[in-house]
Amino acid sequence: IVYRIGVNRVSVQVRELDPVTNRFAELAQFDQGAEEIPAEYTQTRDKADVRFRIAIAEGVTSWQIVNAISGMDIMEGDAGEVPAEGTLAPDSYEVRKGDDRAALLARMSAAQETLLAAAWESRAENLPIKTPEELLILASIIEKETGVSDERRQVASVFVNRINQG
């Protein structure tokens, strides 16, 4: 079962591995919070050997993540306070039924810290950026400006030049 947390919606996809083709076949898909939950979901969710994955798209806010995992019936515990923006890594996380919401958020935060530390260590020299947090903010702005990876370098150079000019 895959929970997809996107910018505009949270969807749930129930899939089963076809041993013949070694591909996943979709059994059901629905939006989280839907009035009617497909029987395929509840039947699959309650099996012992089910794998659960939470996939978070880039651009999703911390509030959206907390709100989504708070509505997942496979998770337990309180999520706690909404973490600061930019502190949760967009990625795919495998979870187990009964996992703690706050522990999942801590995993997401640790993953983001690791990513940010690696980006900070490998940054170009002579950038007018003083902290990893400034690097994250600039990267977020660049990502908002263009989703095209080939354009990021040029957009980044425009921002760096503006910062250098003061």
Regions found by a protein language model. Name each.
Residues 1-166:
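Conserved catalytic or metal-liganding residues and their short signature motifs at active sites
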